Amino acid sequence: MATRINYNYEAAVTYTTLKQNERLMNKSLLRLSTGLRILSAADDASGLFIADQLSLVSTGLQQGNRNIQFAISALQIAEGGVAQIYDKLKTMYQKAVSAANDINDPNARAALQRDIENLRDAIQKIAQDTEYNGIRLLDGTLKNGIYIHYGARSEQKLSVAIDDVRASNLGAYLLDLKGQSNSAYDSFANLLTTDTNFDIASTETISIAGVTHSPPTNIVTDARYIADWINGDPTLQQMGIKAKASNRVVGDPWVNVAVDTGDSLTIKFYVGTSTTPAITLTYGPGKTITLDRIISDINSKATGLNLVAKEENGRLVIETSGETVGVEVSKSGTGGTTFSLDQIISGVNKTVNNTNTQASAIKVGDLRIIDDESYTYDFTGIAGAFGLTSPSGTVGITDLYAIDVTTNEGAELAMDILTIAAQKVDEIRSQIGSTIINLQAIYDAKAVAKDNTDNAENIIRNVDFAKEMTEFTKYQIRMQSGIAMLAQANALPQLVLQLLR
């Protein structure tokens, strides 16, 4: 029973409790009205920090996915341009194959050349004009790579590079060596000794892309031998370097040779790397060496050799798979028989007669080394056999502007150039496609990560309505009971009046 009237302890305590309940009820009301569990740092300091960090990550993930979408759009534009370029290269290749057919007359080949030039110009224009948001995509601008930032952290980026596919940068790194010829009024063996360009000593090395080779013994300089080494070397195979060899030996218009009485004419043919004759033909007195006869004699003894003799426009033509062709002609007797080696190898200017009873000549095959990247070469010691003014160096690109299909040789070279160019463009297109797939996978993963991050933030920051409504109801009932009890507490001092009656 209260016996003092200046201080109502019960009312004061009830009032304090009422204010606390009011504060808690109001906060619960705000949570229900905003949907937020954390209204200020005072509500949950550590929770607010974690939620804000999660929100920051979520924002970064969202923008990163936008970046990916922008990048995919740009890459799709680039891929479309590269696809057009590939289609035009394929058409150019088709026309080069057509031009390689010798049934075409010069006018037909000229028309094919014009078509190829128009397609080449179209490729140049596509590569120069394909862009996204002002950034050129196919002219080499992106050659060194750009970064696509896909995540919420500074290190979360992907490098994307697209090589230059302009016509001036498409082609092959080509070392096109033309086999040379030489001759002497001497034996074939001495010819090789005199001009060492046509002889590869076992102490000499050939080098391609830093890979060197030496023959086990001294051999005749031979394009087929070098091509076989290049194509068979594992290191060069891994680099993608390939080689082709061919040899077409054409003589001057054939003039029948009559062997005089008392004379004998011996013709020896050397094929490939060997200094031993592969074919020996002997014509005695009274024999007439016609074009048909020498062709028949050569072919009958060429079994096992990559060699065939034939007639073209009244000339002797000897073809090999790149093997060097050497010839040694000797005459015995004092008759008036003469034989010009130019009938076998045009341009050697050697004639066997009573004055010069022996002469030799050699024709090395052509060698073509090709790759899709630059490489070094070193032919020191045999450079003269292939017409190289620089025995060593670095091979530069032979681009689409170098294509000329107005000859059979040019058309076949164009096919090699276009094959490498098409491979490069197809590789670039494949890389773009792989990058798009990679970016799409990253996008999907980051989208899931964003959803999970948002959910984690939601658990910390946002209110659980079921739980909070229970809390609000509790505080509301407390307020109602508190107000009622405060009224009762305020009435307690009035009981003192009973003592004053």
Curated annotation (Swiss-Prot):
InterPro entries the record matches: Flagellin, Flagellin_C, Flagellin_N
Cell compartments where the protein resides: Secreted; Bacterial flagellum
Signal peptide positions (record): none
Predominant localisation class: secreted
Record keyword Secreted present: yes
Protein family: Belongs to the bacterial flagellin family.
Record's function text: Flagellin is the subunit protein which polymerizes to form the filaments of bacterial flagella.
The protein, known as: Flagellin
Provenance organism: Aquifex pyrophilus
